[in-house]
């Protein structure tokens, strides 16, 4: 089967410089969702028709299995499909999809394709309580489809029809080529409608078959930011329902956003207002607190991420604890039982098994061993204004509060670093390191008094 995806429209009602089909749904372009659905049907040819913002669209979805046809002028859906004909296999039927209709199920399209075998012309229709704005499916007294009429060209009787055309069709390609060549544009829009092909198919003796999706939202398109927001909520609720069915506990299914792939083990619990982006894995027994953002991360069994934490490109070991208000940046690796607490930032650094940095700390470009205690206010000074250097802290080190490690520097196993120390030289194992300070206490000191105005 050939699949053609129409993605050439301007999307004026989006009021955006970004081509409509590139607006994100769940963090990915609308068009990418449609391409994924098309791929699931294993087409022999996959062609995307581009026009407005053609090069931008091409760059966003380019792949070895995707071919592109260009519609220089947006002269209607029939004209758009015609641009793809040279790239299609005429011996295979063609399924036409739309780059701004992202939620159609693969099973729905397969059902339509199966119904349109043996040189039938298949149309996906849906019955709406309010069909305003859509083309109507006109049938005769026997229930056979006779034509599809667009809203602007419909008579008062036809406007009362509640079965509408979704625009998604399956047609025999060789005949479709002839029918498209014979299309006229004698209509209110002056465009070449793909829907007008139906009458030609009937005249040629082809049976018009219709199927409907299981859910009305499968055929909803995006023409405005409001419609985009509506589809985002539908899609996110579908994803939440799938997580619930898989045994994930969601504090509120309406307050989770998945903008990528979220794989969960058993007994995973997710609190409200969490966002998951890219590829995220939550192993058995993971708990995610409220208002967390987790991107491209792997979190091992039994780990806990407390509220308001932000993880990006991080790996969290079994039974580790993160947060609240922690930030793990790309390259952060926490071993089993490690703790990273409030207002701690870890970047391109490893924290060994059982090590803890519980308060107000920056650990960047560092290798920290097991059972290390990092006191509040500790900073690895990794940048000299031109280059970054690593800090190495071996196992069983105790780091007092308000400590700075000026990289490159290595601190040996079992070292104790006194509070307020700046470490700029390597320290051998089991040493106490501190900066000499004197403390002076003076009697008779009087605090200043605020002057009266």
Curated annotation (Swiss-Prot):
EC number(s) stated in the UniProt entry for this protein: 2.7.7.23, 2.3.1.157
Name this polypeptide is given: Bifunctional protein GlmU
Active-site residues, Swiss-Prot/TrEMBL: 359 (proton acceptor)
Cofactor(s), by name: Mg(2+)
Keyword Metal-binding: yes
Residues reported to bind Mg(2+): 100, 223
Biological process per Gene Ontology, one example term: lipid A biosynthetic process
Reactions catalysed according to its record: alpha-D-glucosamine 1-phosphate + acetyl-CoA = N-acetyl-alpha-D-glucosamine 1-phosphate + CoA + H(+); N-acetyl-alpha-D-glucosamine 1-phosphate + UTP + H(+) = UDP-N-acetyl-alpha-D-glucosamine + diphosphate
InterPro entries: Bifunctional_GlmU, GlmU-like, GlmU_C_LbH, Hexapep, MobA-like_NTP_Trfase, Nucleotide-diphossugar_trans, Trimer_LpxA-like_sf
SUBUNIT field: Homotrimer.
Positions bound to UDP-N-acetyl-alpha-D-glucosamine: 6-9, 20, 71, 76-77, 98-100, 135, 150, 165, 223, 329, 347, 362, 373
Species this protein is from: Burkholderia mallei (strain ATCC 23344)
Protein localization: Cytoplasm
Pfam families, per database record: Hexapep (PF00132), NTP_transf_3 (PF12804)
UniProt region (N-acetyltransferase), positions on chain: 247-453
Keywords: Acyltransferase, Cell shape, Cell wall biogenesis/degradation, Cytoplasm, Magnesium, Metal-binding, Multifunctional enzyme, Nucleotidyltransferase, Peptidoglycan synthesis, Repeat, Transferase
List of residues binding acetyl-CoA: 376, 382-383, 401, 419
Gene behind this protein: glmU
Functional summary from the UniProt entry: Catalyzes the last two sequential reactions in the de novo biosynthetic pathway for UDP-N-acetylglucosamine (UDP-GlcNAc). The C-terminal domain catalyzes the transfer of acetyl group from acetyl coenzyme A to glucosamine-1-phosphate (GlcN-1-P) to produce N-acetylglucosamine-1-phosphate (GlcNAc-1-P), which is converted into UDP-GlcNAc by the transfer of uridine 5-monophosphate (from uridine 5-triphosphate), a reaction catalyzed by the N-terminal domain.
